[in-house]
Amino acid sequence: MISYYRRSHERLFYFIRVSYLANMKKYICSSTLQRLVYALSFSFCLFFSPGKIFAQKVFDFNAQCQKAYQQIIMLKLDDGQKIIDVEKQQHPNNLIPCYLENYIDFFILFFNEDPAEFKTREDNLEKRIKLMDKGPESSPFFLFTKSIIHFQWAAVKIKFGDNWNAGWEFRRSFLFSKENQKKFPSFAPNDMLYGSMQVAAGTIPDGYKWLSNLLGIKGSIKTGMQQLERFLNANNEWVSLYHDEAIFYYLYLKFYIENKKNEVFKFITEKNLDVKNNHLFTYLAANLGINNQQSSYAINVLSQKNNSAGYLNMPVWDMEIGYAKLNHLEPDAAIYLNRFVQNFKGKFYVKDVLQKLSWFYYLQDDQKRADAARKLILQKESAGTEAEKQAQKEALSGVWPNKFLLKARLLNDGGYYAEALQILQGKTSADFLLPQEKLEFTYRLARIYDDMNRKDEAIAEYLITIKMGEHRKEYFAARSALQVGYIYEKKNDKADAIVYFQKCIDMKDHEYKNSLDQKAKAGIARCNND
C-alpha cells in the first residue's frame, strides 16, 4: 500500500515539474532566470519528495532495540546506549530508542540520586513525551511508552523528594495505561504495567480513597496480581522481551504487598534467575534477602555478582553488604557503610545508614566515632522517609539503645535467631529499667519466637507488647498487632487476622505508622479476597 502511494505521488510530482517548466520556458528568456527556475524546481522536488512526505515517526521494537533493552535491564547501560546510538543513525524516525533512553535515565537517577545528573536529565521527560506524541496513535506503543515514561519519573521524583509531582506523574501513567488496556486489550505488556499500578493503587489507605477516586485512580491488589501472573504465564514475543522487568515488579509486590516472602525466594531459585550477571536481579535478591532476615544469603549473592566493566556503578552495593554484615555483628561492616556515605550523592538511606554506623561503633565501645556518626545524622538533609525520621528522632534524643536489645535486634534482623535468643536468654522485662526497654524486650522476644516458628509463645509476647505499648509512640505495639495478624492469616483464621490488622491501623501517632498501616491494609484486602 505504501509503495502504491509513493508511485502515485512520484507521477504527480513528475507531472507538476514538467508542466511547470514547460510553461515557464514560454515566458522566461533570460538564461540566468532560467537556471534559477530550474534550480528552484529541482529543490522543490527534492524537498517534497515522496521519501520526505512519508518519513513519519514509528514504534519499531526491532531486534537491535530488543538487544539494547536487554542490556539496559541488566544495568549494562553503556552497552545499551551504544546500540541505541547505532539504531538512531540507521533508523532516525524510530521512537523506541528514545523510549529506551528513559530507562537509562531512570536507573541512573533512581539508584544513584545524583542531583547534578537530575539537573542534566530532568528536561528529558517533557522532550520524550513530545516525541512519543509524534508516533502513530494506531500503535499500542503510543500510550504504553508514555505510561512507562511517566511511571519511571514518578519513582524518580519520589527519590528526589518531589512527592507532589510524583503523584501527578503516577496519575498520568495510570490513566494512559488504563486507556491503552481498553484500546488494545490483547497487547500483553499492558498486563505488566497496568497490573503493577493496580496493586499499588489498591494499597491506598481508606482515608485517601476519596482523593484517588476523584483522580481516577482505583486499584485492586487481587486484580493487579492476576494481570501480572497472566503476563508471566503467557507465551508470546512480548513476554519474552519484558520478562525480566515483569519479574522485578512481580516479586517486589508479592514480597511487600502479598506478604508471600517464601514464595519469592522459591521463585528466584526455581526460575534460576541470573543474580550474578543481571545486576537488576542481583539488587532484587540481595535487597529482599536483607529485608527477609536472610543476611547470609544476601552476602553470598553480592559476593558473587559480576564485577566486570560496563555495569552501572552503584554505591548502594556498599550499603546492602554493610547492612548484611552489621546484622551479624561482623567487624568489617563499617568499611562498607562508610564507603556508601562517602560516595552516595543522594538523600535516601543516608540518615538510616549513619544510624547503623553509629550503632556499629557504639557496640564496639568506640563512643567517639559513634557520637560523630550521630552528629552527621543531624547535619544531613532528609528525604522524609520513616526510617530517616526514626534515625533523626533517636539522634535528637541523646539516648543510646540498650546494648543487649540492640545486639538481639540486629542478629534477629539478619536471620541469626538462635544467636539472638541466646543474647536474651535468662532475662525478663524486670531486668530493664526504662519503660521503653521493657516494651522492646517483650517485642524482641516475640519476634524471635515468631521467626523460630514458636507461634504460641510469640502471640503471648506480642499481646503483652500491645497492652504495654498501644498508647506509646514506639512502633513495637503496632508492629506486634501486624505480626499477630500475619500469624492468624497463615492459619486461615481470617476473621481474627482482620481484627489485628485493624488494631494496627487504629493505633495513632507512632513510628513507621504509614508503612505499617499500608501493610495492615494489604492484609485486610487479602483476607477479604479483594
Which role does the model predict for each range below?
Residues 57-63, 71, 75-83, 101-270:
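Short coil/linker segments at helix-helix boundaries
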Residues 58-64, 139-140, 187-188, 206, ...:
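Generic helix N-cap/helix-start motif at coil->alpha-helix transitions
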Residues 63-77, 284, 402-419:
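Alpha-helical segment of the N-proximal tetratricopeptide repeat
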Residues 69, 103, 110, 148, ...:
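Residue-level recognition of tetratricopeptide repeat
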Residues 75, 161, 258-259, 293, ...:
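Residue-level detector of the short coil/turn that links helix A to helix B
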Residues 82-85, 117-133, 164-178, 216-232, ...:
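Alpha-helical repeat scaffolds
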